[in-house]
């Protein structure tokens, strides 16, 4: 369910990280436009490789009852290039919740890839894994990402505040949530 995971959409192939993705993921997270909206440092190539090996190990440990981390590469079918990543995992500031996250190369923004990839992942999470609720957090300045979440049916819950000092980078983020019922209703209406 997690190790051999594959999703095909009209334009994308979504699959677990592979070590051959390291240099593309490294270049992606170095893009200033992308990194600006990610509350993490820019990692070295070696650190990216370590994250990939760790992600492969996590996929072996993931289960329907507990997703430790589910990191996925987004490949554009036409070019066969890695253009981004998405995934599911515990929220850093609310460990009991599963969070959707994604990032795409700046040169692909505005083409609907984020919506296409995350919609497919949510469909899998709700219909196959059996999750009931998924959250997402986004910086208020990231209007394009807010639009993606709203298009998917996520509803704004609150602004993240009063976190402990070690989580200060998440302070002020907007917290969104979607239920299985709402997502599947929205999918039927399309």
Where are these regions (language model features)?
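Conserved GNAT-fold acetyl-CoA-binding loop/helix
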Residues: 33-57
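Acyl-donor (CoA/ACP) binding surface of acyl/acetyltransferases
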Residues: 1-36, 71, 75-190
